[in-house]
Amino acid sequence: MNIKPLADRVLILPAPAEEKTIGGIIIPDTAKEKPLKGEVVAVGHGTKDEEMVLKAGDTVLYGKYAGTELEVEGTKYLIMRQSDVLAVLG
């Protein structure tokens, strides 16, 4: 399935949550923190007031409660406004 975000929205594939702590303790699924980092998969065309700065392939940081979760063919994504992205890594 091909998803194309509209306007100033971006589609993000969240990075997998950490399985272990630095000390080697395995974290159960119920205790894992929601990832705050992910890869931009697709971007909208922007709005007349705001051009799109992000592009597919960018690794980004976003807020803990940013975006809307959706699942497509077994893969979980987030869709959010470009303004919800806090930083581009790398």
Curated annotation (Swiss-Prot):
It holds the Pfam family Cpn10. Signal peptide: none annotated. One of its GO terms (biological process) is chaperone cofactor-dependent protein refolding. One of its GO terms (molecular function) is protein-folding chaperone binding. Keywords: Chaperone, Cytoplasm. GO terms for cellular component: cytoplasm. It is found in: Cytoplasm. Belongs to the GroES chaperonin family. HAMAP family: CH10 (MF_00580). Together with the chaperonin GroEL, plays an essential role in assisting protein folding. The GroEL-GroES system forms a nano-cage that allows encapsulation of the non-native substrate proteins and provides a physical environment optimized to promote and accelerate protein folding. GroES binds to the apical surface of the GroEL ring, thereby capping the opening of the GroEL channel. Heptamer of 7 subunits arranged in a ring. Interacts with the chaperonin GroEL. This is Co-chaperonin GroES.
